[in-house]
From Swiss-Prot:
Binding residues for ATP: 37-44
Keywords: ATP-binding, Cell membrane, Membrane, Nucleotide-binding, Translocase, Transport
The name this protein goes by in its record: Energy-coupling factor transporter ATP-binding protein EcfA1
Known EC number: 7.-.-.-
Family: Belongs to the ABC transporter superfamily. Energy-coupling factor EcfA family.
Chief site of localization: membrane
Species per Swiss-Prot/TrEMBL record: Mycoplasmopsis synoviae (strain 53) (Mycoplasma synoviae)
Subcellular location: Cell membrane
Quaternary structure note: Forms a stable energy-coupling factor (ECF) transporter complex composed of 2 membrane-embedded substrate-binding proteins (S component), 2 ATP-binding proteins (A component) and 2 transmembrane proteins (T component).
Membrane topology annotation: Peripheral membrane protein
Amino acid sequence: MIKLNNVTFRYRPSDENPAINNVSLEIKKGQYVAILGHNGSGKSTLSKILVALLKPQKGELFIDGIQYSKENLKEIRKKIGIIFQNPDNQFIGSTVEDDIAFGLENKNISRDEMRTKVVEYAKVVDMEKHLSREPEYLSGGQKQRVAIASVLALDPEVIIFDEVTSMLDPKGKSKVIQIIKQIQADKDKTLISITHDMDEAILADTVLVFAKGKLVAAGSPKDILNEEKIIEIAKIASPFIYKISKHINGIEPTYVEEELISQICK
Protein backbone atom coordinates (compact mmCIF):
# COMPACT_ATOMS: atom_id res chain seq x y z
CA MET A 1 0.00 0.00 0.00
CA ILE A 2 2.74 2.46 1.04
CA LYS A 3 6.42 2.07 0.23
CA LEU A 4 9.37 4.37 0.81
CA ASN A 5 12.78 3.66 -0.71
CA ASN A 6 15.70 5.63 0.78
CA VAL A 7 13.63 8.79 1.29
CA THR A 8 15.42 11.93 2.51
CA PHE A 9 13.94 15.36 3.22
CA ARG A 10 15.49 18.64 4.42
CA TYR A 11 13.48 21.78 5.16
CA ARG A 12 16.49 23.91 4.13
CA PRO A 13 19.45 22.89 1.95
CA SER A 14 21.75 24.22 4.67
CA ASP A 15 20.35 21.84 7.33
CA GLU A 16 23.13 19.53 8.47
CA ASN A 17 20.74 16.83 9.66
CA PRO A 18 17.79 15.89 7.42
CA ALA A 19 14.31 15.84 9.00
CA ILE A 20 13.90 12.45 7.29
CA ASN A 21 17.17 10.64 6.72
CA ASN A 22 17.38 7.80 4.17
CA VAL A 23 14.19 6.05 5.35
CA SER A 24 12.90 2.86 3.76
CA LEU A 25 9.71 1.18 4.96
CA GLU A 26 6.61 -0.63 3.77
CA ILE A 27 3.06 -0.51 5.13
CA LYS A 28 0.69 -3.17 3.82
CA LYS A 29 -2.99 -2.68 3.00
CA GLY A 30 -5.24 -3.03 6.04
CA GLN A 31 -2.44 -2.64 8.59
CA TYR A 32 -2.68 -0.40 11.64
CA VAL A 33 0.77 1.13 12.08
CA ALA A 34 1.92 3.51 14.80
CA ILE A 35 4.83 5.82 13.98
CA LEU A 36 6.34 6.62 17.34
CA GLY A 37 8.94 9.14 18.38
CA HIS A 38 9.78 12.15 20.52
CA ASN A 39 9.48 15.77 19.34
CA GLY A 40 11.90 16.36 16.48
CA SER A 41 12.13 12.68 15.56
CA GLY A 42 10.76 13.28 12.05
CA LYS A 43 7.43 11.52 12.46
CA SER A 44 5.22 14.51 11.57
CA THR A 45 7.46 15.39 8.61
CA LEU A 46 6.92 11.83 7.42
CA SER A 47 3.13 12.24 7.64
CA LYS A 48 3.32 15.33 5.41
CA ILE A 49 5.42 13.41 2.89
CA LEU A 50 2.86 10.59 2.85
CA VAL A 51 0.01 12.97 1.97
CA ALA A 52 2.17 14.72 -0.65
CA LEU A 53 2.37 18.04 1.21
CA LEU A 54 6.15 17.73 1.19
CA LYS A 55 8.23 16.32 -1.65
CA PRO A 56 11.27 14.16 -0.81
CA GLN A 57 14.56 15.46 -2.19
CA LYS A 58 15.87 11.92 -2.51
CA GLY A 59 14.35 8.48 -2.77
CA GLU A 60 11.05 7.07 -3.99
CA LEU A 61 7.51 7.10 -2.55
CA PHE A 62 4.79 4.74 -3.76
CA ILE A 63 1.13 4.91 -2.71
CA ASP A 64 -0.91 1.91 -3.82
CA GLY A 65 1.67 1.21 -6.52
CA ILE A 66 1.65 4.80 -7.82
CA GLN A 67 4.99 6.60 -7.65
CA TYR A 68 4.92 10.13 -6.29
CA SER A 69 5.22 12.71 -9.06
CA LYS A 70 3.80 16.12 -9.90
CA GLU A 71 1.58 14.54 -12.56
CA ASN A 72 -0.22 12.12 -10.23
CA LEU A 73 -0.39 14.26 -7.09
CA LYS A 74 -4.18 14.55 -7.27
CA GLU A 75 -4.62 10.80 -7.61
CA ILE A 76 -2.35 10.11 -4.63
CA ARG A 77 -4.13 12.64 -2.40
CA LYS A 78 -7.49 10.99 -3.10
CA LYS A 79 -6.18 7.80 -1.54
CA ILE A 80 -5.08 9.36 1.76
CA GLY A 81 -6.92 11.32 4.42
CA ILE A 82 -5.25 13.02 7.38
CA ILE A 83 -6.48 14.37 10.72
CA PHE A 84 -4.08 16.91 12.22
CA GLN A 85 -3.10 17.72 15.78
CA ASN A 86 -5.06 20.94 16.29
CA PRO A 87 -8.83 20.48 15.81
CA ASP A 88 -9.34 24.24 15.40
CA ASN A 89 -7.20 24.30 12.25
CA GLN A 90 -9.30 21.85 10.24
CA PHE A 91 -12.91 22.84 10.89
CA ILE A 92 -14.12 24.30 7.58
CA GLY A 93 -17.92 24.30 7.77
CA SER A 94 -20.13 26.64 9.78
CA THR A 95 -21.77 23.64 11.49
CA VAL A 96 -20.92 19.99 12.13
CA GLU A 97 -23.15 18.94 9.22
CA ASP A 98 -21.53 21.43 6.83
CA ASP A 99 -18.05 20.30 7.82
CA ILE A 100 -18.72 16.61 7.17
CA ALA A 101 -20.51 17.46 3.90
CA PHE A 102 -17.75 19.75 2.62
CA GLY A 103 -15.67 17.08 0.89
CA LEU A 104 -18.74 15.33 -0.51
CA GLU A 105 -19.84 18.37 -2.51
CA ASN A 106 -17.29 17.58 -5.24
CA LYS A 107 -18.42 13.97 -5.63
CA ASN A 108 -21.50 14.64 -7.77
CA ILE A 109 -23.98 12.97 -5.45
CA SER A 110 -27.54 14.04 -4.69
CA ARG A 111 -28.42 16.12 -1.64
CA ASP A 112 -30.38 13.19 -0.20
CA GLU A 113 -27.44 10.81 -0.57
CA MET A 114 -25.10 13.43 0.88
CA ARG A 115 -27.35 13.90 3.90
CA THR A 116 -27.49 10.11 4.41
CA LYS A 117 -23.70 9.87 4.35
CA VAL A 118 -23.29 12.82 6.72
CA VAL A 119 -25.58 11.18 9.28
CA GLU A 120 -23.88 7.80 8.78
CA TYR A 121 -20.40 9.12 9.54
CA ALA A 122 -21.60 11.40 12.32
CA LYS A 123 -22.93 8.25 14.01
CA VAL A 124 -19.55 6.53 13.67
CA VAL A 125 -17.98 9.29 15.80
CA ASP A 126 -21.01 9.73 18.08
CA MET A 127 -21.79 13.25 16.83
CA GLU A 128 -25.17 12.68 15.15
CA LYS A 129 -26.96 14.69 17.86
CA HIS A 130 -24.75 17.73 17.20
CA LEU A 131 -25.14 18.20 13.43
CA SER A 132 -26.53 21.74 13.72
CA ARG A 133 -23.97 22.94 16.27
CA GLU A 134 -21.36 25.55 15.42
CA PRO A 135 -17.65 24.86 16.11
CA GLU A 136 -17.32 27.44 18.89
CA TYR A 137 -19.77 25.39 20.96
CA LEU A 138 -17.81 22.15 20.63
CA SER A 139 -15.03 20.80 22.84
CA GLY A 140 -11.62 19.97 21.37
CA GLY A 141 -12.47 16.28 21.47
CA GLN A 142 -15.77 16.84 19.66
CA LYS A 143 -14.04 18.89 16.94
CA GLN A 144 -11.49 16.12 16.48
CA ARG A 145 -14.30 13.57 16.12
CA VAL A 146 -15.93 15.76 13.45
CA ALA A 147 -12.58 15.90 11.64
CA ILE A 148 -12.44 12.09 11.66
CA ALA A 149 -16.01 11.90 10.29
CA SER A 150 -15.12 14.40 7.54
CA VAL A 151 -12.20 12.22 6.43
CA LEU A 152 -14.23 9.00 6.63
CA ALA A 153 -16.90 10.55 4.40
CA LEU A 154 -14.31 10.91 1.63
CA ASP A 155 -13.62 7.16 1.87
CA PRO A 156 -9.81 7.23 1.52
CA GLU A 157 -7.88 3.97 1.53
CA VAL A 158 -5.38 5.29 4.09
CA ILE A 159 -6.14 7.43 7.15
CA ILE A 160 -3.34 9.20 9.03
CA PHE A 161 -3.94 10.38 12.60
CA ASP A 162 -1.21 12.98 13.24
CA GLU A 163 -0.92 13.49 17.02
CA VAL A 164 -4.73 13.65 17.16
CA THR A 165 -4.99 13.21 20.95
CA SER A 166 -2.07 15.38 22.08
CA MET A 167 -4.20 18.51 22.65
CA LEU A 168 -7.18 16.73 24.22
CA ASP A 169 -8.15 16.22 27.85
CA PRO A 170 -8.23 12.59 29.15
CA LYS A 171 -11.95 12.18 28.39
CA GLY A 172 -11.59 13.51 24.83
CA LYS A 173 -8.48 11.40 24.27
CA SER A 174 -10.20 8.24 25.45
CA LYS A 175 -13.16 8.80 23.12
CA VAL A 176 -10.97 9.44 20.07
CA ILE A 177 -8.87 6.33 20.76
CA GLN A 178 -12.08 4.33 21.10
CA ILE A 179 -13.20 5.59 17.66
CA ILE A 180 -9.84 4.69 16.09
CA LYS A 181 -10.18 1.16 17.49
CA GLN A 182 -13.72 0.98 16.08
CA ILE A 183 -12.53 2.09 12.63
CA GLN A 184 -9.79 -0.54 12.79
CA ALA A 185 -12.36 -3.25 13.56
CA ASP A 186 -15.15 -2.17 11.19
CA LYS A 187 -13.54 -0.50 8.17
CA ASP A 188 -11.24 -1.87 5.47
CA LYS A 189 -8.69 0.90 5.93
CA THR A 190 -4.96 1.24 6.36
CA LEU A 191 -4.45 3.29 9.54
CA ILE A 192 -1.33 5.22 10.49
CA SER A 193 -1.07 6.86 13.91
CA ILE A 194 1.68 9.47 14.35
CA THR A 195 2.27 9.75 18.08
CA HIS A 196 4.72 10.18 20.94
CA ASP A 197 2.35 8.33 23.29
CA MET A 198 3.07 4.62 23.81
CA ASP A 199 -0.40 4.17 25.34
CA GLU A 200 -1.78 5.02 21.89
CA ALA A 201 0.88 3.12 19.93
CA ILE A 202 0.18 -0.20 21.68
CA LEU A 203 -3.17 -0.40 19.86
CA ALA A 204 -1.36 -0.85 16.54
CA ASP A 205 -0.32 -4.06 14.78
CA THR A 206 3.15 -2.68 14.13
CA VAL A 207 5.18 0.14 15.68
CA LEU A 208 7.81 2.07 13.71
CA VAL A 209 10.14 4.01 16.00
CA PHE A 210 11.82 7.20 14.77
CA ALA A 211 14.68 9.20 16.28
CA LYS A 212 16.57 12.10 14.67
CA GLY A 213 14.93 11.51 11.31
CA LYS A 214 15.81 7.83 11.13
CA LEU A 215 13.77 4.64 11.46
CA VAL A 216 15.52 2.98 14.42
CA ALA A 217 13.20 0.04 15.14
CA ALA A 218 10.15 -1.80 13.86
CA GLY A 219 8.08 -4.55 15.46
CA SER A 220 5.02 -5.38 17.53
CA PRO A 221 4.27 -3.09 20.50
CA LYS A 222 5.50 -5.80 22.89
CA ASP A 223 8.75 -6.26 20.91
CA ILE A 224 9.42 -2.52 21.06
CA LEU A 225 8.69 -2.28 24.79
CA ASN A 226 11.13 -5.11 25.48
CA GLU A 227 13.97 -3.19 23.78
CA GLU A 228 15.26 -0.93 26.56
CA LYS A 229 17.90 0.62 24.31
CA ILE A 230 15.26 1.65 21.76
CA ILE A 231 13.02 3.07 24.50
CA GLU A 232 15.96 5.17 25.70
CA ILE A 233 17.04 6.37 22.23
CA ALA A 234 13.50 7.37 21.23
CA LYS A 235 12.71 8.87 24.67
CA ILE A 236 9.51 6.84 24.91
CA ALA A 237 7.57 6.58 28.17
CA SER A 238 6.39 3.00 28.72
CA PRO A 239 2.71 2.46 29.63
CA PHE A 240 1.97 2.39 33.37
CA ILE A 241 0.72 -1.23 33.32
CA TYR A 242 3.91 -2.34 31.57
CA LYS A 243 6.11 -0.59 34.15
CA ILE A 244 4.27 -2.36 36.99
CA SER A 245 4.33 -5.81 35.37
CA LYS A 246 8.05 -5.52 34.63
CA HIS A 247 8.87 -5.25 38.34
CA ILE A 248 6.80 -8.23 39.51
CA ASN A 249 8.82 -11.44 39.81
CA GLY A 250 7.49 -14.39 37.82
CA ILE A 251 5.26 -12.20 35.65
CA GLU A 252 5.79 -11.76 31.92
CA PRO A 253 5.76 -8.01 31.19
CA THR A 254 2.52 -6.87 29.55
CA TYR A 255 0.77 -3.61 28.70
CA VAL A 256 -2.69 -5.21 28.89
CA GLU A 257 -4.36 -4.79 32.30
CA GLU A 258 -6.46 -7.96 31.94
CA GLU A 259 -3.33 -10.02 31.18
CA LEU A 260 -1.56 -8.63 34.25
CA ILE A 261 -4.51 -9.45 36.53
CA SER A 262 -4.78 -12.95 35.04
CA GLN A 263 -1.08 -13.67 35.65
CA ILE A 264 -1.21 -12.36 39.23
CA CYS A 265 -4.29 -14.49 40.01
CA LYS A 266 -2.75 -17.75 38.74
